[in-house]
Amino acid sequence: MVKCDKSPVAPASLKVEKLKGENGSYRGEDVVEQLKTDFHDKCYICELKGLQDPEIEHLVPHKGNLDLKFDWNNLFWSCGHCNSIKNQRKYDGKIINCCQEDPELHIQFLYTDNNIDVKPLDDHEETQMTAQLVDEVFNLRNTGMRVIKSAQRMKALQREMNIFFNELKRYQENKSETNKRRVVVRLKRSAAFAAFKRSYIRNKDEYAEFQEYVSLMK
């Protein structure tokens, strides 16, 4: 999970649909397209990119509350897998708003030996619960479908990290501007699984020239 710069202007359909009450829809074409663009077509929780099963997720469950249901600031781009796991009651209203707060200030997203370690850096409830959620979307296997979907995300992360490590190796062997740019592109917040790559660089003193690209948004 990384910081997302979300458009401050709510899509017009939300206001229109809210007037319809319970029959209104927050899934208008303008909402879908704006969320897809703002979140770079990746799930805000697991950071899988190019979603085949995108869903519009409410950061705070609306439970029939029309203000929450149609609040642009409460709508996020998610995959079905992460949305289903976050729907556990224990997470209600306890997840970091990555459009207002930089999750990387509060959590380390570590990738080691083909596995993840999501470490909260403070004792705030939102930090603790967000770290737990990210861990669960990669590791929770309490149903048959979750076994498959969690494994798919772990494999996708492993593939992306292997590509990233190869780009770093290429750069170490030849520190050209072209090779540097190839690394920098994968450190952008818009990249797949950016939090894990950015944490990796942030914890490596030998990559001082890349630290400016993984700065935190305080």
Q: Each predicted region: which residue ranges?
A:
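DNA major-groove recognition helix of helix-turn-helix/homeodomain DNA-binding modules
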Residues: 82
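Conserved, surface-exposed functional patches that form binding/active-site neighborhoods
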Residues: 90-172
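Short, charged surface segments at domain edges that flank catalytic/cofactor-binding sites
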Residues: 1-42, 65-70, 162-169
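C-terminal, charged low-complexity interaction regions
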Residues: 135-218
